[in-house]
Design a protein with these regions (language model features):
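Short beta-strand His + acidic residue motifs that chelate non-heme Fe in jelly-roll/DSBH
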Residues: 53-54, 73-74, 82, 92, ...
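A short, N-terminal "cap"/entry segment at the start of jelly-roll beta-barrel domains
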Residues: 1-39, 53, 122-135
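A short beta-strand-loop-beta hairpin characteristic of the jelly-roll/cupin
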Residues: 60-86
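A generic "binding-loop/recognition-motif" signal
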Residues: 50, 59-60, 78, 96-97, ...
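Conserved hydrophobic/aromatic beta-strand scaffold that supports enzyme active sites
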Residues: 41-45, 63, 81, 89-91, ...
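Residue-level recognition of conserved beta-strand positions in structured domain cores
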Residues: 43, 56, 67, 75-77, ...
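Ligand-binding loop in jelly-roll beta-barrel domains
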Residues: 86, 94-120
């Protein structure tokens, strides 16, 4: 079959470590259920006021698409703050320091897609408290 469909009920949610002092996040891998070979895809759930771990991925570029809630992402060094509402997206190029956050009072649900399909070579860097909005 030249396509695969992954329904919401097919997702297997797993807890993932968050930044220090924040509640764990959840991810649902889509790469294998969708039989992707050249890229990686995941759904993410961030509880209110949760931060992912700040990191640099030297090889993978990623696209983040918020489906529910506002996705806040800190990019570059020094970091700049970008807020993305549902209907928008942010593309992060390889080698860019980044940290995804949910600074809202409701759960953030977003889709993340990256290529190439490499995993495990990100470098984690120091967390930051806040950053100015991007100009």
């Amino acid at each position: 079959m030249p396509f695969d469909v992954v329904q919401a009920d097919d997702l297997q949610w797993e807890k993932r470590e968050a930044a220090d002092g924040t509640e764990p996040r959840q991810q649902a891998p889509i790469t294998e259920p969708a039989k992707l070979t050249q890229s990686r895809a995941r759904m993410w759930r961030y509880p209110p006021h949760t931060r992912g771990r700040r990191h640099i991925d030297p090889d993978q570029e990623e696209v983040f698409v918020p489906l529910r809630g506002t996705l806040t992402i800190l990019l570059e060094d020094p970091p700049q703050r970008i807020d993305v509402a549902p209907g928008g997206l942010v593309a992060v190029h390889s080698g860019t320091p980044m940290q995804v956050r949910n600074e809202g009072d409701e759960e953030l649900l977003f889709f993340a897609y990256g290529a190439p399909a490499v995993h495990g070579n990100a470098t984690f860097v120091d967390d930051v408290v806040d950053a100015p909005p991007a100009s």
